[in-house]
Amino acid sequence: MQLLAVGLNHTTAPVSLREKVAFPADQLGQAVASARSWYGRSDATTYTDEAAILSTCNRTELYAASNLPGGVNEAIDITAHFLADYHKLPYAELRPYLYALPQDNAVRHAFRVASGLDSMVLGEPQILGQMKDAVRQAEAAGGLGTYLHQMFQRTFAVAKEVRSTTEIGAHSVSMAAASVRLSQRIFDKISEQNVLFIGAGEMIELSATHFAAQNPKSVTIANRTLERGQTLAHRFNGKAIRLADLPDQLASYDIVISSTASSLPIIGLGMVERAIKARRHKPMFMVDLAVPRDIEAEIGRLDDVFLYTVDDLGSFVQTGVENRQAAVAQAEAIIETRVRSFMHWIDARAVVPVIQDLHESSETMRMIELERARKLLAKGEDIDAVLEALSKGLTAKFLHGPQQALNNAQGDERARLAALLPQLFRTKR
């Protein structure tokens, strides 16, 4: 059994591709089942017993515990075909952007991701919650077995250790904070701007918190469910509107921050063109934090619109990285120690079937000799003589296999067994 992590992220693929292979949160369980089924197809030489999928705005990754007779390259191909088939994309479009990490590299990657070392925002905490959600869904879908369950439990423990014993998350600039900084390049005073947030999830809540600190002129939450939008808007003394109201009200807002789970764009080119015309070409600042994107990319070409995606925010969120290099080194050292510990556990698991076979074989021998002793006792034989025969019979049966193997071996094989048997039976020789 081998562990494998296959996927793409913000360092290997642009948002235009990442959004095509993103899995909606409510489809992760179904996707895990599909992945396991795909790996087990008769035309595939790889079979996965366990699988989990992590899908965020910055990455889509499949973790698997599989038999891999074809090696890593075959695993990449099979996973790429699965992703392409599931999302109805050309295989050739995905293959160059994928990475595949086997065994200890897969474990190390999972530990680094959960600890925030592989994030666009170094040390950001949201990824840990996202990974926990992915694992819960994989478990509910039957995707977790002995290996992935143990790996993810250790992953969460490592992430907790890294975050509690290092400064990896200190002074990091989040996407939400970067959005505020960028908007201040367009508008001198946020306090004079009307801000619209589309969605009501964690990212929007974080963004609204950062913008609220700048005392904007107004705050509005647009959400598919009005009640949920109202709950969030109340926290920021704002109002809530329905997504259906956006075409008529978009022109009222100077700053638009969007992050929903929609699989299709919510704001189209025509809607923004009409809004800009109604605003008499007053600039509009827009940040699309969603993957797949909520705002059509073509909108960024409009003269009076400043549109940024998660990839565009990358340079802003690197602030303070240099100051955290010592924390990174500490975190990497912790991770390396924990990877070695986990791989030792993996190696130990490999001999479990051998140990089980030994127990079963010994139990069979024991039952044979015990039954023979019971029959002798039933005939009235002397108990000491029966016990003596029982002990000798067990000894003979236990040693028969090793003795026969040693007698039948020749040359180097006999020398190897002769050196090994004293270690196994802890004799003096």
Swiss-Prot record:
User: Which CDD domains does the UniProt entry name for this protein?
Assistant: NAD_bind_Glutamyl_tRNA_reduct
Q: What is its EC number?
A: 1.2.1.70
Q: Which Gene3D superfamilies match?
A: Glutamyl-tRNA reductase, N-terminal domain, NAD(P)-binding Rossmann-like Domain
Name any one GO molecular function: NADP binding
Which InterPro entries does the UniProt record give? 4pyrrol_synth_GluRdtase, 4pyrrol_synth_GluRdtase_dimer, 4pyrrol_synth_GluRdtase_N, GluRdtase_CS, GluRdtase_dimer_dom_sf, GluRdtase_N_sf, NAD(P)-bd_dom_sf, Shikm_DH/Glu-tRNA_Rdtase
Binding positions for NADP(+) per the UniProt entry: 199-204
* Recorded metabolic or biological pathway in which this protein acts: Porphyrin-containing compound metabolism; protoporphyrin-IX biosynthesis; 5-aminolevulinate from L-glutamyl-tRNA(Glu): step 1/2
Q: Where is this site: Important for activity?
A: 109
Residues given in the record as substrate binding sites: 56-59, 119, 124-126, 130
SUPFAM superfamilies the UniProt entry points to: Glutamyl tRNA-reductase catalytic, N-terminal domain (SSF69742), Glutamyl tRNA-reductase dimerization domain (SSF69075), NAD(P)-binding Rossmann-fold domains (SSF51735)
Keywords of this entry: NADP, Oxidoreductase, Porphyrin biosynthesis
Q: What class of enzyme is it?
A: oxidoreductase
Record's comment describing the protein's domains: Possesses an unusual extended V-shaped dimeric structure with each monomer consisting of three distinct domains arranged along a curved 'spinal' alpha-helix. The N-terminal catalytic domain specifically recognizes the glutamate moiety of the substrate. The second domain is the NADPH-binding domain, and the third C-terminal domain is responsible for dimerization.
Per UniProt, subunit arrangement is: Homodimer.
What NCBIfam families does the annotation carry? hemA
Record function comment: Catalyzes the NADPH-dependent reduction of glutamyl-tRNA(Glu) to glutamate 1-semialdehyde (GSA).
Q: Please, what other remarks does the record include? A: During catalysis, the active site Cys acts as a nucleophile attacking the alpha-carbonyl group of tRNA-bound glutamate with the formation of a thioester intermediate between enzyme and glutamate, and the concomitant release of tRNA(Glu). The thioester intermediate is finally reduced by direct hydride transfer from NADPH, to form the product GSA.
Could you say which protein family the record assigns here?
A: Belongs to the glutamyl-tRNA reductase family.
- What's the protein here called? Glutamyl-tRNA reductase
Q: Which organism is it from?
A: Janthinobacterium sp. (strain Marseille) (Minibacterium massiliensis)
